[in-house]
Amino acid sequence: MEHPKRPTPKNEALHIDASGRGESSFSVHRSHSGGHEPFAPSPGSSIGASVSMFSSRNSEAEVGDAEDLDGVRTIMMNIGVPDLLADREIQMRYPEFYQFLLAEQPTWFEPAPSNGTVYRVHHTTPLPDNHKKLRKELPFEMLDLMYRFFRQKHVNSQRKRENKELLEANKQLRIAAVQMFTKAEQEEEYISNSLLKKIQQLNQDKDYLVKKYQKDEESLTKSLMANVAKIPDVHGDEAAAEKLMADKQAEIERLRTYCSRAEKSYQEELMRLRAEKVDHESALEQEQELLINTLGKRMSQMNEEKRKLQQALEMAYLNGFVDFDDTVEVALHASASQKYNGNSPNVSANSPVVNTNSPAVSTSSPLVRNTDQQSTSSYRQQLNETAHLHIENKKLVGMCNQERRRSQATEAEVKKLNQRMSKMEAVLEAIRIEAVRTDGPLAWRLAALSHDNSIDEPPHRMLAERRAHGSSPPTVVVQPSTSRAGSNSTANINNDTHPHAQVAPILATVHPTQRATPARNERPDSHY
């Protein structure tokens, strides 16, 4: 089966008409190379790949004319008898041919050469002896047509695929061209806008410089005109010059008179200020003397109060109103030593009085000033000591009040303890009465123990001592023992009288023994 010849142009190119800017203005047409340059696609583009498919010599999709090729071209066909048997369309449309293929299985058959093209089929069997005769039969001619039909069908599918690829490439090229021209327009617009802004800025700068230049020119012109107007006329009248000189001389004389008057008034003011300074200094000295005398009197009063407070503290300490303290003891010793050594040279300095009426006292004398400074320092020291003693006095008063509160609390506790003691004595008396009623020997023992205690100390003294100490005497439970002789006899009598009776314990009140202790106000070193 011969294929129709298709002229293959030597120079085919894809030309884009860029005269317009719309998408419809881009037309794709194939033309000869008359007046246009050939189109050279890039190696990586889809167009180059699709065009390169036509350049392979042994490709299945290549269908060329015999005169364009130098020799015989061989094409391998991938279709065979099993593929024809598997086609349902052949089975339905050509049942006799299908039965022929199924019965004969002509796998040795290959299509006849056409226009210098030799067809080869894969997986062929050896040729039979009468293969030339068999080729002329109708079934084998039908088989040859089927081979060529499937070959052409395959070529058509490849051409459709290539056409589709070309259409896609054309579409991509159109989109790329539109994008390229859009981008070019955007860049052009951006450049034009930026240039327009720069031009506007330059125009504004130009206007500003022109205005500034005009303003500077006007100001310079005005200043020059003013300076020219201020320049005096050198060639003026001599009378005007003489008048000006006379005016200047009169001004100078007036200023000299004013300076002399001002100097005289300043001298008078200076003398007046010096006199006022002397008056103020004398008044200040008198006030200082008055203050010194007042402070001397106050210091004497404070010393008297200090002495009285020391005496009161000493009396309170000696009478026992204040507890023993090392600080108070040292202060009392110091006051006693000052009292015995009172005729010291510093006694006369405790109350200095400055006589302001004496004419011998002068503020300009350095000896008097030194004496005033010493007396002032001594007064300050005495004032500090007086303040310290006043603070100490407040502390002592607070301590006395605290001790008074403690003594009141102690008296309240003593009253409570006395009430408890009276209750305990009543209970003991009841116990004694009960013991007398129940057991005669036990009552006798209690009476003997009470008699012994009453012999040791009088009852009224015992009660006074117990109340003074503020605590009740301890009660001791004494178990009967057989250590004493008298107790042995009593126990034997009791056992004989009551052989099966249990011996009851003895309740005894133990009074503490009074020790000779030094008095509260007595010093520890007075015994020596």
Curated annotation (Swiss-Prot):
Keyword vocabulary terms for this entry: Repeat
Compositional bias annotation for Polar residues: 472-496
Stretches the record annotates as Disordered: 1-51, 467-497, 509-528
Sequence repeats: 185-213, 285-313
Region 2 X 29 AA repeats, residue ranges: 185-313
Pfam families in UniProt: DUF2046
Claim: Repeat is one of the keywords in the record: yes
Protein name, entry field: Uncharacterized protein T09B9.4
